Structure formats: C-alpha cells, structure tokens
C-alpha cells in the first residue's frame, strides 16, 4: 500500500479513536468528526485523480457538501447547548427534546 494512503487511513483512525475517547464533550466530538471527514475527502480526491473516471470526479464535492452541512448543524447544536446549560456535554442533548 502506498504510504500516502496509509497516512490518510492513520489520520482517519486517530480521529475515530478521538471520537470514541472524547464522546462526552460535543466540541471534541465535532473536531474529531471534522478530522474524519477531511481524511475521507482527501482519500476520495486521490482515488478520483488516480482512476480518472468522470463518475468519480463529483464524489469529493458531494462529500464536502455533506461535511459543511454536518458542521453547520453541529455548531448550531453546540451554541444551543452552551447558551442553555453553559456546558458542552452530549448528555444535555436529551434535555433539548420537547
């Protein structure tokens, strides 16, 4: 396996481990999720460049759109929780239900 791909997979794995370790804080979880999305974006971009297929050229852009939507929703939840409770614990998400 090419060392570039191994480094990107290592970045994804480290972000996944960070997500599992810091799952009680929303800010740390969002940062780890962004790291995972960026490593997936780089991986799909490299695959699209190597295959040179017109069908795979749109995949990194679609992934980037979903990452931006995920970041916007995550930051909205973070602002809502921090304004309401002053903390960024994920267990406060259950308290936001009507």
Swiss-Prot record:
InterPro entries reported in the protein's UniProt record: NADH_UbQ_OxRdtase_chain4L/K, NUOK/Mnh_C1-like
Keyword Repeat set for record: no
A GO cellular-component term linked to this record: mitochondrial inner membrane
Membrane topology listed for this record: Multi-pass membrane protein
Catalytic activity: a ubiquinone + NADH + 5 H(+)(in) = a ubiquinol + NAD(+) + 4 H(+)(out)
Record localization: Mitochondrion inner membrane
Mutagenesis / variant outcome for changing residue 9 to V: In strain: Isolate 704
Entry-linked Gene3D superfamilies: 1.10.287.3510
EC number assigned by the record: 7.1.1.2
Transmembrane segments: 1-21, 29-49, 61-81
Molecular function per GO: NADH dehydrogenase (ubiquinone) activity
Outcome when changing residue 94 to S: In strain: Isolate 704
Keywords, in A-Z order: Electron transport, Membrane, Mitochondrion, Mitochondrion inner membrane, NAD, Respiratory chain, Translocase, Transmembrane, Transmembrane helix, Transport, Ubiquinone
GO biological process, one term: ATP synthesis coupled electron transport
The protein's assembly and partners: Core subunit of respiratory chain NADH dehydrogenase (Complex I) which is composed of 45 different subunits.
Family as reported in the entry's similarity comment: Belongs to the complex I subunit 4L family.
Function: Core subunit of the mitochondrial membrane respiratory chain NADH dehydrogenase (Complex I) which catalyzes electron transfer from NADH through the respiratory chain, using ubiquinone as an electron acceptor. Part of the enzyme membrane arm which is embedded in the lipid bilayer and involved in proton translocation.
Protein name, per record: NADH-ubiquinone oxidoreductase chain 4L
Phylogenetic lineage: Eukaryota, Metazoa, Chordata, Craniata, Vertebrata
């Amino acid at each position: 396996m090419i060392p570039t791909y191994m480094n990107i997979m290592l970045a994804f794995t480290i972000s996944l481990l960070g997500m599992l370790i810091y799952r009680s804080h929303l800010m740390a979880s969002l940062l780890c999720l962004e790291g995972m999305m960026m490593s997936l974006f780089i991986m799909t971009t490299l695959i699209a460049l190597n295959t040179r297929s017109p069908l795979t050229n749109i995949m990194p852009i679609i992934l980037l759109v979903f990452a931006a939507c995920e970041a916007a929703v995550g930051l909205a939840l973070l602002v809502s929780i921090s304004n309401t409770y002053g903390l960024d614990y994920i267990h406060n998400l259950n308290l936001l239900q009507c």
